[in-house]
Amino acid sequence: MARTDHDRWDLATSVGATATMVAAQRALSSDANLIDDPYAAPLVRAVGIDVYVRLVDGEIQPGTSEFDPHRMAKGMACRTRFYDDFFLDAARAGVGQAVILASGLDARAYRLPWPAGTVVYEVDMPDVIEFKTLTLADLGAQPTAQRRTVAIDLRDDWAAALREEGFDTQAPAAWSAEGLLVYLPEQAQDALFDNITALSAPGSRLAFDFVPDTAVFADPRWRAHHERMSELGFEVDFNDLVYHGERSHIVDHLSGRGWRVTSRTIAELHAANGFAYAADDVAAAFADVTYSSAVLGG
């Protein structure tokens, strides 16, 4: 079903189901000892989407060269390490506020070794925030930072809601937009980064991943892969969930607003983690995806 401007979801539907899928991939990475996320698998089981529960429980076996749990684990390990390192590097540099936009089932507020006094803000839909908070409490998990939740749609006035939760616009912050931008309309994407800039003190940091052209989700190479995955029970169709059409190139957008941006391709990110990027049609379709970090001013 195509997106609408005011659509809503939980962790089992629409965009929310992609957060559960990502958590399942983190669970595979953790099982392979590539990252350490002890909460990923329990959260996936709590959501209860059958295909992802079976995936984390090892009940789905490789059916094609493109669907390989080990490959999924490596890919998600690269992405997770990128954002983990980003936040920890910022914290070690004295940045005491972290903002995780579209936090989904992200458990960094519970699993990263944050310095004392760090405040971690999680921004996402109310149903998503409530589910994760209650589930982690039931698991006995305790935050390793001061965790503050902002239950709001990023298409609404999330900046005001963030300030109401105590965000300090006079102190630097570290921001992440992980796996987020394709799910925003062009105007909302630009507004997101304009709001981040307006809220950020000099020395603030930002990390994001960017798909230059969402038409990749309609690419025949990806569609063929999607059909094979559907046969295994994966129902998420990214082509229906992402917003298509031209949009600003975020690096240019941010550079014009005072951010110094450093980017690497998805293949370079794999290489930096000791993995070879795959050489098949699906990998080729996403070869232009980039991972970027930025610093404001200075």
From Swiss-Prot:
The keyword RNA-binding is annotated on this UniProt entry: no
EC numbers: 2.1.1.-
The protein's name: Putative S-adenosyl-L-methionine-dependent methyltransferase MAV_0778
Residues annotated for S-adenosyl-L-methionine binding in this entry: D124, D153, L154
NCBIfam families, sorted: mthyl_TIGR00027
Gene Ontology annotations of biological process type: methylation
GO molecular function: methyltransferase activity
Main function: Exhibits S-adenosyl-L-methionine-dependent methyltransferase activity.
Stated family: Belongs to the UPF0677 family.
Record key words, sorted: Methyltransferase, S-adenosyl-L-methionine, Transferase
UniProt keyword annotation of GTP-binding present: no
One Pfam family per UniProt: LCM
Organism of origin: Mycobacterium avium (strain 104)
Signal sequence bounds: none
